[in-house]
Every structure is written in structure tokens, then in C-alpha cells.
Amino acid sequence: MYSSENDYSILEDKTATGKKRDWRGKKRRANLMAEHYEALEKRIGAPYYGKKAERLSECAEHLSFKRDPETGRLKLYQAHFCKVRLCPMCAWRRSLKIAYHNKLIIEEANRQYGCGWIFLTLTVRNVKGERLKPQISEMMEGFRKLFQYKKVKTSVLGFFRALEITKNHEEDTYHPHFHVLLPVKRNYFGKNYIKQAEWTSLWKRAMKLDYTPIVDIRRVKGRVKIDAEQIESDVREAMMEQKAVLEISKYPVKDTDVVRGSKVTDDNLNTVFYLDDALSARRLIGYGGILKEIHKELNLGDAEGGDLVKIEEEDDEVANGAFEVMAYWHPGIKNYILK
């Protein structure tokens, strides 16, 4: 649970498989992001950025856990998360929650419909920072149109859509794209099959593009039981349902892609400025068809704007026989210490 250094103890929180949860790394990255928002306030003069910097600095300052007396495992039960879109700490917690929700939804879809699964990636050309926000809006509208086309509606049972943005730092451009997990009828792979060229043509039409976009489509092979514990691991195995869940539930933007290095730089500030503008107050994930229905049936919360303390939905009995473990962020040591 902890390791001692001098007269204080350092927080150690591990998954059931023994992998260490990187609370320290996420908090340090959140504080670095706060420094960038502070610098943006000085550069632009807008209090908006200063307020976000303050929220980031206060994110996860204190963590309260319950420790299971039998296993020794910690379970977070109290914390304050800032929910700033670009916060590395909150992005990590959010991705765990989305992955866990998707695990439950996919298992239920398999049970109810016995469906097949395909993994679709929809892209457009890279854009400059000032074009990122309108480009994402156009993509959202294009996605809506795509799923209104008869060919798609008759072949696909629903969707889970996630937006991801990567940055080409050398060219100073941004690459927004959609990862989409699609449940399909079992006969989809026969007469209803939509080939890659057709998906490409439909996406081009929906987006009204004057070029041919890159579209990737692949079948999700295998129907394995998804292990919730693996959600916290960076699994890069064969393309199976579990891999698809992990792939599609990851962060919309990797924090290391936003802030490079450990110092405030002009390049980093520009990246934070454009990504903050493009992503604030925007839904980055979406469910449709049977997956939306199942999400509602299972009474799952809002993974984007909801509680980031409780990842798993079911109530467990750990709290009954557990005792409290409090961890506090120490700015000098730059780590969580136990009191």
C-alpha cells in the first residue's frame, strides 16, 4: 500500500494484477497543464484561462481511499476532480469510466443480439489550429448524415463514436478523426457487407469533400469475455473485442501530445489554446441505435460530465469492513503522501 521515505509514506495504489496506478504522474502533468493556462492568461489577458489554471492546480489534491482488510487493495471513494477538458488526471479517469461502460454495453449487446462488430476510423485532412473547431463541427454533422444513409441504416445496428485529435508538431497541424465501434447484424458479412471503398465514398459524400479521405474498416475478431481489470492496461494484442474497447475508450487527446516536455513553450501554448477552444463544452463521445438503448437500460451515468470517483457502477461491500486511507499531494516532494 505504501513505501516509507524518511518520516512520511508515499501512496502506492495498484490494480488487482499488481500494476501501479500512476497518480503521481497524472497530478504532475495536471500541474504542468495549469502552468500553461496561467501563461495563456498572461498572454491573452482573459480571466477564463486563469480560472482553469486554478481548477487544474486544485485537481485531486486529496485522495481518500478505502482499504480492503483482506486483499489490501485500495478503492478510491472521495476526491475532487477539476473536469477541465485537457486535464491529464481527469482524462485518465474519464477514459477508465468510458471503457468500463463500453465493456458492460458490449457484453449486453452480445447477449441480446449476438451481433458482430466492426471498427471504423473516419478521417479528414490535417488542419491548422484556427480551422480545428469548425472542422470538428463539420465532422459531427457529416457523421450524422453518414448514419442516415440507407445503406448504413440497413446494415448497422448502432454505434459508439469517439473523437480523437493528434498533432503533427513538425507541420503545426491537427488531425481530428473518429473511432467508431459498430454492432452489425450477423448477415452483415454476407449480402449487407459495406466494402472499404464504399465506406470511403459515403464519408466523402457526407462531408462534401473534394478529395478522397482515408477510411479504415476492420472486423473485430473473436468474442472473448472482457476483463475489466485489463481496462487499465495498455493492451496491444490481436484485434478482439477487448482490444476494440480499449482502443475506442482512450483519451481524445494524449496529454503528451498537447504539452511536450516539462516546460511552458510557445508551441505548447498554441496547442493548448486551439485544443481548449475546439473541445470545450463539446460532446466528444456518442452512442446510437442499440448501444444508446442499452446505455439507457443499464442506467449508466454520464462518463464525460459525471462523477469521476466511482468508475465501476455496481456497489461493492469493501466499505463495510474497510478503513480509511488519506493521501495528500505534497508540492515539495511532488508526490502523494499518506497521513
Swiss-Prot record:
Keywords: DNA replication, Plasmid. It comes from the Bacteria. GO terms for molecular function: DNA binding. One of its GO terms (biological process) is DNA replication. Signal peptide: none annotated. InterPro entries: Rep (IPR000989). DNA binds at residue 251. Belongs to the Gram-positive plasmids replication protein type 1 family. This is Protein rep. The lineage of its organism: Bacteria, Bacillati, Bacillota, Bacilli, Bacillales. The gene is rep.
